[in-house]
């Protein structure tokens, strides 16, 4: 346990030391959520996004406030999510089922791990030029597009490249 505390302290100190003061987006972030491997990630320029890419997203309002008020993510912190759909693709939620371009991609849950009801959106939409859909399909407990739907592409602050994770 002491070894883990030392590693976490070193990662935190490294992150602060490498964080450019003039930049509002971090160069490195620590992910503590289990929806992707826990660990240190370096952020790279976005450029053109691809489906399945792991990105850091700054939640837009009112999502950011919802996440903070309900204890999912402190205000101002980015979340790591996989890009599941890009502009021009069709994303649907019918009941709990998430479908992208007629392919079932996963299920939403009714309640979170604490038993609280989760947000629900329904219907189909073709993503606009400025929208993406993010979902960590490998994690059934991830709070992602299953619950909040598409988000602005401008919410992406960088590609997340693993530096060190608990799965290495």
Which residues make up each language-model segment?
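Protein maturation boundaries and topogenic segments
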Residues: 1-78, 126, 148-168
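Residues that act as N-cap/strand-start positions at coil-to-secondary-structure junctions
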Residues: 35, 77-79, 85, 118-121
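Surface loops and adjacent helix of pleckstrin homology
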Residues: 46, 60, 96, 103, ...
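Mid-length scaffold segments of soluble, non-membrane domains
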Residues: 75-107
């Amino acid at each position: 346990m002491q070894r883990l505390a030392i590693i976490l302290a070193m990662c935190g100190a490294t992150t602060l030391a490498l964080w450019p003061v003039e930049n509002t987006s971090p160069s490195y972030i620590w992910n503590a959520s289990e929806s992707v491997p826990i660990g240190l990630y370096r952020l790279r320029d976005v450029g053109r996004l691809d489906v399945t890419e792991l990105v850091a997203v700054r939640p837009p309002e009112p999502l950011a406030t919802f996440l903070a008020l309900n204890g999912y993510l402190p205000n101002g912190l980015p979340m790591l999510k996989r890009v599941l759909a890009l502009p021009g693709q069709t994303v649907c939620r019918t009941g709990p089922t998430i479908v992208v371009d007629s392919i079932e991609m996963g299920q939403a849950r009714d309640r979170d791990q604490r038993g609280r009801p989760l947000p629900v959106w329904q219907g189909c939409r073709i993503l606009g030029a400025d929208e993406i859909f993010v979902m960590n399909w490998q994690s059934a407990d991830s709070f992602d597009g299953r619950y909040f739907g598409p988000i602005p592409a401008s919410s992406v602050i960088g590609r997340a490249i693993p530096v060190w994770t608990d799965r290495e």
